[in-house]
Regions:
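Beta-strand/loop subdomains of soluble extracytoplasmic proteins
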Residues: 73-76, 81-90, 124-129, 143-164
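Active-site substrate-binding loop(s) of clan PA
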Residues: 18-19, 66, 91-93, 107-142
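N-terminal activation segment of mature serine protease catalytic domains
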Residues: 9-49, 56-59, 99-101, 238-243
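Short, conserved beta-turn/loop elements at beta-strand boundaries and strand-helix junctions
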Residues: 52, 95-99, 153-159
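Catalytic-histidine neighborhood of serine endopeptidases
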Residues: 51-97
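Active-site region of chymotrypsin-like
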Residues: 23-40, 106-115, 144-242
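C-terminal segment of classical bacterial N-terminal signal peptides
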Residues: 1-8
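Short, well-ordered loop/turn sites that connect or cap secondary structure elements
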Residues: 50-51, 122, 199
Length: 243
């Protein structure tokens, strides 16, 4: 039984290098651009192109900041094309706070779009991958890929030790629960908005949106828990249908 799983995993992973060639051109760094600021570009998270290639899906919390419109601050995406770093301005079209999703529209050129898969068919134990910018653009625009199994399909509200840790957002999640994918992979704050995809087909089955943090927020980088979460892609499909 163990041998058969290893053979299956190895067979699936042999196609990952080819799939990555299709995935990486669609993955962008999401941030803001302000001409009078130093630095002018500030990284917020990851996103990826969908539909016609001019629409970018990311997390609602990634684009949750208020823009300094008086000084012409705008959302922007950053990516590498033909080995050159590129930037495009983007407009925030819609936000789904309940499922932590947001949709941006590019101002100019379109990017290769990723296909949204059927997340209702995802099973625990299946192997997937996600690609994004875990520590931002510090090392340049080079998206990083991690593999992960679906460790569990569980409610979106993370358990708390005592009632003092409860907040309004957590209570809202308890009122309108839905399932998310729990992963056995280490994701970092910059991975928010990264596509979680099938390593055989490249179809997106989820979007990374949070990590389980032990202690303070700084521990997300210095002492990661190795537990991450992704929103199923069925909610992305609904967002796109209503755009």
């Amino acid at each position: 039984m163990l041998l058969s799983y290893r053979v299956f995993a190895q067979a699936a992973e042999t196609g990952l290098p080819d799939i990555l060639q299709r995935i990486k051109p669609s993955v962008v760094a999401v941030g803001t651009y302000l001409p009078t600021r130093n630095p002018r570009a500030v990284f917020l998270g990851t996103g990826f192109a969908v539909n016609d290639g001019r629409h970018i899906v990311t997390n609602a919390h990634v684009v949750g900041k208020d823009l300094d419109s008086d000084h012409m601050e705008r959302f922007a995406v950053f990516y590498r094309e033909n080995d050159k770093e590129q930037m495009q301005m983007a407009e925030l079209l819609t936000v789904d706070q309940q499922h932590d999703l947001a949709l941006l529209r590019l101002a100019e050129a379109k990017l290769p779009a990723l296909e949204i898969g059927d997340s209702t068919r995802v099973r625990e134990g299946a192997l997937y991958a996600f690609t994004g910018y875990p520590i931002g653009m510090v090392l340049g625009l080079y998206p990083v890929t991690h593999r992960s199994i679906i460790a569990a399909i569980s409610p979106n509200a993370i358990p708390v030790v005592n009632s003092r840790q409860l907040n309004i957002n957590m209570l809202k999640k308890l009122e309108t629960p839905y399932n998310v994918f729990q992963l056995d992979a280490t994701a970092y704050p910059g991975n928010s908005g990264s596509p979680l995809y099938d390593i055989e087909t490249g179809k997106v089955i989820g979007i990374i949106n949070k990590v389980f943090v032990q202690g303070s927020k700084e521990n997300a980088i210095s002492n990661p828990s190795g537990i991450s979460y992704a929103i199923p892609a069925e909610h992305i499909s609904r967002l796109l249908a209503g755009k």
